[in-house]
UniProtKB/Swiss-Prot annotation:
One of its GO terms (molecular function) is formate-tetrahydrofolate ligase activity. It catalyses: (6S)-5,6,7,8-tetrahydrofolate + formate + ATP = (6R)-10-formyltetrahydrofolate + ADP + phosphate. The keyword Zinc does not apply. The gene is fhs. Belongs to the formate--tetrahydrofolate ligase family. Pathway: One-carbon metabolism; tetrahydrofolate interconversion. InterPro entries: Formate_THF_ligase, Formate_THF_ligase_CS, P-loop_NTPase. ATP binds at T65, P66, A67, G68, E69, G70, K71, T72. Its EC number is 6.3.4.3. It is an enzyme of class 6 (ligase). The lineage of its organism: Bacteria, Thermotogati, Thermotogota, Thermotogae, Thermotogales. It comes from Fervidobacterium nodosum (strain ATCC 35602 / DSM 5306 / Rt17-B1). GO terms for biological process: tetrahydrofolate interconversion. This is Formate--tetrahydrofolate ligase. Pfam families: FTHFS. Keywords: ATP-binding, Ligase, Nucleotide-binding, One-carbon metabolism.
Length: 552
């Protein structure tokens, strides 16, 4: 089979204005970036209030192997297949971060015959949204140090500055640094660090904002430090207007197309552990007005991205979820069944059946939200017929084989039919699991016990102290985003399959006041990844004609 980039180069793309015309987007609402990419004015959404929403399909996954289980590929394939069977569909996705593109994971534009295009542009810089977020983030950082240098009127405590610098790259050397060395002209020396842009609260805020006014308000509410009179916010250093100005184009959704010319919005990219892990609300809401079926995905597995989408994102945006698709793979179930990563390509039906427990937990969890569930078994070339049969026979929810990677929409037709049939015959009774008025501790306990299957929640002394501070400052009933490992349902990455009855430990809290949630930290969360020994970057090249190779 050809590589992803070779397949992409064979695709016959339509002019982006034709894609917009298919969606009835007026040309004066379009800002083309070349022939195949365009931004859609976010204000266009306000003109569509009278139109009914389409159906919203949330794609999530079982607890993944390090290589991932093909969530994006499945989302794209499902949307293409829905169009193929006569349903108008749009797929909405997050933008790829350059860090993973050059690191282990590679790009985030799908794969095989299920891609969004042009993949080189989407994976490398795209329309500059992530760079705009980086610049807005670092403007705030620069203004903090300028304020301190010029008298520090707010009495900012140099030991309690929460706002680091940001960069869209994996660079472990920048996690912990010392700045302002070289004399008094350079400011006050202090400890600082970098996080990857996808982990910036600016990214989370961009993905939740309704419009520029809301974006500016949210940026202003971001807590950046402790000062002599309590918490210091961005608005206290008067940086919200300039930061929002840097994002005036980034707030507009990016319209592209799939390999089969299905419309796609690729917009925003917050982490699914430290933040909510899905594309912008503006893009999803616009897609719901322009199509019959919207396919969107949430980061990592159902215990992370889907839980956050169903308990926080959908209520925040006033969204109704009509169905959940859980992406599963034979190799992931073998992994959860005890097979080592080196032996995942060998047939092992017993391990598959044992690993089905992980899938069952995620299905049970999603049904607690009142949404119907369909399982997409993402086929890989190493899967055997016996292994596939074992999953199809033993899955506790409707399970359909998905071959979009190898066959495009043709390989996802049965999945599309199953999803449509489910939506038409099993009405969704979607309701968030976590009531919005509960105190933070009760929200954490509910999520930990119902979704993570923990027996007890314990707090470190640091977490208890920070929780007290949260309550004192009015955050005691805020929505909660739990940041934990993606490699286990639990807070311990070594606990594979379906652990239960364990102690779930909250070690610290962070405030994301602009985004509108508090983050409960469970386990070590890496906000600035590092490159591996053999990064994907070593395989990426460009020739004298500008042809890029090695992207995946």
């Amino acid at each position: 089979m050809l590589s992803d980039i070779e397949i992409a180069k064979q695709a016959r793309l339509k002019d982006i204005r034709d894609i917009a015309k298919f969606l009835d987007i007026p040309e004066d609402m379009l800002k083309p970036y070349g022939r195949y990419i365009a931004k859609v004015d976010h204000r266009y959404l306000n003109t569509l209030n009278a139109k009914p929403n389409g159906k919203l399909i949330l794609v999530t996954a079982i607890t993944p192997t390090p290589a991932g289980e093909g969530k994006t590929t499945t989302s794209i394939g499902l949307s293409m297949a829905l169009n193929r069977i006569g349903k108008k569909s749009i797929v909405t996705l997050r933008e790829p971060s350059l860090g993973p593109v050059f690191g282990v994971k590679g790009g985030a534009a799908g794969g095989g015959y299920s891609q969004v295009l042009p993949m080189e542009d989407i994976n490398l810089h795209f329309t500059g949204d992530i760079h705009a977020v980086t610049t807005a983030h670092n403007l705030i950082a620069a203004m903090i140090d300028a304020h301190i240098n010029h008298g520090n009127e707010l009495g900012i405590d140099l030991r309690k500055i929460y706002w680091k610098r940001a960069m869209d790259m994996n660079d472990r050397a920048l996690r912990e640094i010392v700045i302002a060395l070289g004399g008094s002209a350079n400011g006050y020396p202090r400890e600082d660090g970098f996080l990857i842009t996808a982990a910036s609260e600016i990214m989370a805020v961009l993905c939740l904002a309704k419009d520029l006014t809301d974006l500016k308000r949210r940026i202003g509410e971001i807590v950046i430090a402790q000062g002599k009179n309590g918490l210091v916010r961005v608005k206290d250093i008067q940086a919200e207007g300039a930061a929002a100005a840097l994002l005036k184009d980034a707030i507009n959704p990016n319209l592209v197309q799939t390999i089969e010319n299905t419309p796609a919005f690729v917009h925003g990219g917050p982490f699914a552990n430290i933040a909510h892990g899905t594309n912008t609300l503006i893009a999803t809401k616009l897609a719901l007005k322009l199509s019959d079926y919207v396919v969107t995905e949430a980061g990592f597995a159902a215990d992370l991205g889907a839980q956050k989408f169903l308990d926080f994102v959908a209520p925040t945006g006033g969204l109704f979820v009509d169905a959940v698709v859980i992406v599963a793979s034979i190799r992931a179930m073998k992994y959860h069944g005890g097979v080592s990563k080196d032996n995942l390509n060998e047939e092992n039906v017993d391990a598959v059946i044992k690993g089905l427990e992980n899938l069952k937990v995620h299905i049970e969890n999603m049904k607690k939200y009142g949404v119907p569930v369909v399982v997409a078994l993402n086929r890989f070339s190493t899967d055997t017929e016996k292994e596939i049969e074992a999953v199809l026979k033993n899955s506790p929810a409707k399970c359909v084989l998905n071959e979009a990677y190898a066959k495009g929409s043709e390989g996802a037709i049965e999945l599309a039919k199953a999803v449509v049939e489910t939506i038409e015959n099993v009405p969704s009774n979607y309701k968030p699991l976590v009531p919005s008025d509960l105190p933070v501790e009760q929200k954490i306990e509910l999520i930990a016990k119902e979704i993570y299957r923990a027996g007890k929640v314990i707090y470190t002394d640091t977490a208890k102290s920070k929780l007290s501070m949260l309550k004192k400052n009015g955050f005691g009933n805020y929505p909660v985003i739990i940041a934990k490992t993606q490699n286990s349902i639990s807070d311990d990455p070594k606990k594979i399959n379906a652990p239960s009855g364990y102690e779930f430990t909250v070690r610290d809290f962070q405030i994301s006041a602009g985004a509108g949630f508090v983050v409960a930290l469970a386990g070590e969360i890496m906000l600035m990844p590092g490159l591996p020994k053999a990064p994907a970057a070593v395989n990426i090249d460009i020739d004298e004609n500008g042809e890029i190779t090695g992207l995946f």
